[in-house]
Amino acid sequence: LWGVRINESVDDDAFYTRTNQIAHQLDPSRATSGVRYLEKSHLLEDVYAYNDFSHNGVTPGAKPKKDVTPDMGKALLISECNGHMYPTKPFDDGPHRQEHALRHVRVQNAAYASGEHAGCFGWCMFDYQTHKDFGSGDRICYHGVLDSFRNPKLAAAVYASQGDADPVLAVSSSMDIGDNPAGQLGTAYVFSNAQQVRLYKNDVFVTALRQSEWTALPHPPFVTVSYTHLRAHETRHD
């Protein structure tokens, strides 16, 4: 896929007609596109690429195709999502890092479920340096699923777990009550490409975890049992 528009630029039909033609002349085997922040802008390329930052943790994961592209007969690609909507440092507390991961889950699941998206790219792979008026006061944008040194954050496991080449299993919570408001652990998730995840406590089988609601993904996250459930199970085996 060749990008033939300046990133997030406004329409310029004369210029972009020419760039589209040149790309096709140089490589007839690949489709063309161009990253937009605009809905229903002039589509001269083969694929409408759109930065969909509509998900805020509560809203749907992705906008419907009919609300974004002017041509339903051409493919729609989500070229960016999340990123600045929920900056996350690797040293943020557990609930923040979990919500960061779940936002990527929700958007990817929505893109899969719709059947209308050719693909969905999260913004972005790595944290990156920026100027003094952007980022977190330290000239760093914490938009990545990995940090600047390529160390994975929890959200990286969301993407790793969708593949089948290597076994992946990452628990979203450290289960430390001091990382959670009022010491309440709440719901935790397991990001894995396993067919089943079984929970043991002190070598005693507790339960097989159920899959989460995001079933459009190739490998939906698993939902852990509650801390209360674990305590009750511990009491039964004391």
How does the language model describe each region?
Residues 207, 213-214:
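A short acidic/small-residue loop/turn micro-motif
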Residues 1-151, 155, 162, 166-179, ...:
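Substrate-binding/catalytic cleft of secreted carbohydrate-active enzymes
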Residues 228-235:
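Conserved small/polar residues in nucleotide/adenosyl-binding loops
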Residues 172, 200, 225-227:
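A structural detector for beta-sheet-dominated domains
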Residues 187-208, 231:
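Beta-strand-rich binding/interaction modules
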Residues 214-227:
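Aromatic sugar-binding surface patches on proteins
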